Curated annotation (Swiss-Prot):
Alphabetical keyword list: Coiled coil, Nucleus, Ribosome biogenesis, rRNA processing
Principal location class: nucleus
Protein name: Pescadillo homolog
Location of the BRCT domain: 361-451
Molecular function as annotated in GO: ribonucleoprotein complex binding
Cellular compartments per GO CC: nucleolus; nucleoplasm; preribosome, large subunit precursor
Composition bias type Basic and acidic residues, residue spans: 564-581, 662-672
GO biological process, one term: maturation of LSU-rRNA from tricistronic rRNA transcript (SSU-rRNA, 5.8S rRNA, LSU-rRNA)
Function noted in UniProt: Required for maturation of ribosomal RNAs and formation of the large ribosomal subunit.
Positions of region (Disordered): 283-316, 563-678
Length: 678
């Protein structure tokens, strides 16, 4: 008995998927509006296994299109479409006043419900925050071009959101890694157990390429701005709720979000410091400066705030009593003074820092150190890293807590080959010293990063210990020794060091090394028995591996062989790098930390540039080998004479280069040989 016949398009891929043209017709939207709605709702095209309408079409799931049909933004988009027709009609009739009035009455919409819909919990929003932060920081550096419909208000909003995020990272001490590349600065922060990574472009003049669809990027940015506002609001209020003073005195909660920018610092292009002065206080200010400048700040900050939320809250709260303001100023002054004294006496290896607590180690790494940033170094990335790791940042300009001549400055960040005037009471380092010290959780030696010297290789902190079997540079081994020494110092400072330690500078593995030494001492009683037992264990492991290989299925064996091939290729690559490093060390082209010396690099470049000229002068296409026999030319091509040796006979009877006696060792290259004619 035959089965029931099914109608075409009622089941399978034809019933589950729909083309983009069909979706646009069903929703009664323009293609640009449909694309915008899909971006805001998070609907992506699908790839069915069998495409019923053709291979060159874009498909969407039918359930997604039905879900879009119930979106409230559809009515708003249709209203905007009808309103645009009215504006165009008024402009066609040369009625400028009506067109201007209608353009000001364009329907608006909000995306708050979409954020709550796509991210049910706050942790979900943090997990999907990487692209949002990268896009916001990108548009914060772009110019407002009317040619590409990039409004100035959007750029200013991105700038404000980026600074608010950086200020929270500094205040909470959540920054963990930073890496400088050609694309920009990669930052990674740990917030509520979630790792958030974003990219900040270099502060250069941006040239907008014409082949980029900025409308699509602005649509993504529209949703990302709303998402980041939600996240910043939640993070700031969580930070405020953690402070006991905010629970006792609710007036402080008005300063949490949005933070108030200091007009003086904002005009001096120190936006991050301007926000930090409000949410955390300028820890690097002297007590006298805090008391003198905070006289009427509580009254002056309210009118200059651009946010309507802050003005409404301030109006509802009313003016604060003068006694209350005096108590607030006195409390801030005392807290700032206490922090100043304790920070100057602390540090990464100071007492009270638990080595197992990464947040405490990161927050106290630069404690008690004042960094003066030169005019040639990037201020914002360095200020973000320095303040997030407990340091104090100063610069040349208005609003700086310290001047360049201040004796409190311990480090000066410069990026010049030579420094004219130097202070003996401070260290002069390159910007890479700050990033490497923050990544490795240890203060690196300053002589390696002195001005005018080639710094060590900038190792990526995102690789970490995941590539233990791969190539390990020499500088990474040096960093590990420094980290072991720093961890041992922190253990001693915290009172957790084991008694009876030898007190050496570089403690290798700590307690694990002591336990291993005890095990070796116990096994040394019967060394021969231990060796026999070890050999038997190896044989047993080999036998088990062979048995497991026999019992594997064909698919599992193929996968296992692929894994072994990849591991072998990896080991071969490591051996190549090791041999290359050995050759560079033998020729003296590599420094002690693996960096290429400038002199050696210049000699290599000069030799490479002079090679074509020597070949042209000799009339051949090969180069004379120093102290070695030149290889035989292919297809009758001549070669220059080898130094001190006779060149081999040419193939097929064609011309060869006449060998001549080379000068003494250490002299110039051999004289070019004359080419014979047939």
């Amino acid at each position: 008995m035959a089965g029931k016949k099914l109608k075409k398009g009622k089941s399978g891929n034809a019933a589950q998927y729909i083309t983009r043209t069909q979706a646009v017709r069903k929703l009664q939207l323009r293609l640009s509006e449909f694309r915008r709605l899909c971006i805001l709702k998070g609907v992506h095209p699908r790839e069915p296994k069998k495409k019923p309408k053709g291979a060159n079409k874009t498909y969407y799931h039918l359930k997604d299109i039905n879900w879009l049909a119930h979106e409230p933004l559809l009515n708003t988009f249709r209203s905007i479409k009808a309103h645009d027709k009215k504006v165009r009609k008024a402009r066609a009739k040369q009625n400028k006043e009506l067109a201007k009035r209608l353009a000001a009455l364009t329907p608006t919409y909000r995306l708050d419900h979409l954020v709550k819909e796509r991210y049910p919990s706050f942790v979900d929003a943090l997990r999907d925050l990487d692209d949002s932060l990268t896009m916001v920081h990108l548009f914060a550096t772009l110019p407002a071009e009317s040619k590409y419909d990039i409004p100035q208000r959007t750029v200013q909003l991105c700038r404000r959101l980026a600074l608010e995020w950086q200020a929270y990272v500094v205040r909470s001490g959540a920054l963990r890694r930073v890496f400088v590349s050609v694309k920009g600065y990669y930052f990674q922060a740990e917030i509520l157990g979630q790792s958030v990574t974003w990219l900040v472009p270099h502060a250069l003049s941006q040239v907008l390429p014409p082949d980029v669809d900025y409308k699509v990027m602005l649509t993504f940015l529209e949703f990302y701005n709303t998402l980041l506002q939600f996240v910043n609001f939640k993070l700031y209020h969580n930070l405020g709720a953690a402070l006991p003073s905010l629970r006792v005195y609710p007036l402080f909660s008005q300063l949490r979000y949005p933070p108030v920018l200091d007009p003086r610092l904002e005009e001096a292009a120190a936006e991050l410091a301007a926000i930090m002065k409000d949410i955390a206080g300028m820890e690097e200010e002297e007590p006298e400066e805090v008391d003198s400048e905070a006289g009427d700040e509580d009254d002056d900050d309210l009118p200059v705030l651009d946010s309507g939320t802050r003005r409404r809250r301030a109006a509802a709260a009313g003016p604060a009593p003068r006694r209350w303001r005096c108590w607030v100023r006195t409390t801030r002054t005392r807290m700032t003074t206490c922090r100043w004294v304790s920070d100057r006496a602390g540090g990464a290896c100071g007492p009270g820092v638990d080595p197992s607590d990464e947040a405490a180690v990161c927050g106290s790494l630069f404690r008690g150190r004042v960094f003066f940033l030169g005019r040639e170094v990037p201020r914002e990335p360095l200020m973000l890293v320095i303040r997030a790791f407990g340091g104090v940042a100063a610069w040349d300009g208005d609003g700086s807590p310290h001047a360049e001549t201040d004796e409190a400055v311990t480090h000066q960040i410069v990026d010049r080959p030579k420094q004219g005037h130097k202070f003996l009471s401070r260290e002069y380092v390159q910007p890479q010293w700050v990033f490497d010290s923050a990544n490795f959780r240890v203060l690196m030696p300053t002589d390696l990063y002195a001005p005018g010297t080639v710094p060590p290789p900038h190792l990526s902190p995102f690789v970490g210990e995941a590539d233990e079997d791969g190539y390990t540079p020499d500088f990474a081994k040096t960093v590990r020794r420094l980290q072991d020494a720093a961890n041992a110092a922190r253990l001693r400072a915290a009172g957790l060091a084991l008694k009876g330690a030898d007190g050496s500078e570089f403690v290798g593995e700590g307690a694990d090394g002591a336990a291993a030494a005890d095990g070796e001492g116990a096994a040394g009683e019967d060394l021969a028995a231990a060796e026999r037992q070890y050999a038997s264990e190896l044989a047993k492991e080999d036998e088990e591996a062979a048995m497991a290989d026999i019992m594997m299925t064909r698919k599992a064996r193929k996968m296992y062989n692929n894994m072994k091939q990849k591991e072998a290729a990896k080991q071969e690559r490591v051996q190549q790098l090791e041999s290359k490093k050995a050759k560079l060390a033998a020729t003296g082209a590599a420094g002690p930390m693996g960096q290429v010396k400038p002199a050696a690099a210049g000699k290599a470049a000069a030799a490479k540039a002079a090679a074509p000229a020597k070949v042209a002068a000799s009339g051949g296409k090969g180069a004379a080998a120093k102290g070695k026999e030149a290889p035989a030319p292919a297809k009758g091509k001549g070669t220059p004479a080898a130094k001190g040796k006779e060149a081999p006979a040419p193939a097929k009877g064609k011309g060869a280069a006449a060998a001549k006696e080379a000068p003494a060792k250490g002299g110039k290259d051999a004289a070019p040989a004359k080419r014979q004619r047939r």
